Amino acid sequence: MSHINHGRRKWLSLGGIVLGASLLPNTVLAAVSTPKPRLLSFRNINTGEKLSAEFALGRGFNNATLRLLDHLLRDKRTNQVHRMDPNLFTKFYQVQQNLGLRNTEIQIICGYRSATSNAAMHRRSRGVASNSYHIRGQAIDFRIDGIPLAKVRDAVDALQNGGVGFYPRSNFVHMDTGPVRTWRGS
């Protein structure tokens, strides 16, 4: 009789394990398929405006936040707003992860630049490209307070995705979504 009970216990235990295992994939799948919130915080040093928001929802972008970011990154000279490449924000998120940061304020030096503003800057400085990625909404000049500029540059460069300009005297890093390339400015 004890032999039968022992066998019955074994089958009941095995049934419990099988039942538990059948529930596990859904739990694991739910945990894996729910992405972490992708938060970014910005301060435009020219206007003093700040924005801290979730730029992506699930696997896509948060369009309401993208519109706010477009406004924050507008041309400081003309106040013109232009659609920024959302991939820039994914890159910012990856840069913060590379630096071991989480939702740390990113100081914006320059985002979108109208063709008029860019032409005026190009006339004053050889360092401004006549066909800058800023005109297309594909570039941002920035720094992260408290993080050495060279370390920020290295974190952007590690992505091997787009352009990286290093401007130590001007205290900013240029990041864009154009072809992979690097340069050093003043």
Show the residue positions of the predicted features.
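Charged, often glycine-rich, active-site loop that binds/positions anionic groups
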Residues: 115-130
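Active-site acidic/histidine clusters and adjacent loop/turn architecture
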Residues: 58-109
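Catalytic cores and adjacent binding grooves of peptidoglycan-active enzymes
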Residues: 2-3, 38-43, 127-186
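Short amphipathic beta-strand/extended segments with alternating polar/hydrophobic composition
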Residues: 51-56, 184-186
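C-terminal segment of N-terminal export signals and the immediately downstream linker at the start
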Residues: 25-53
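A mature extracytoplasmic/lumenal domain signature
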Residues: 44-46, 55-57, 110-112, 144-146, ...
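N-terminal secretory signal peptides and thylakoid transit peptides that target proteins
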Residues: 1-22
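Extracytoplasmic/secreted envelope proteins and their assembly/folding machinery
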Residues: 89-96, 118, 149, 153
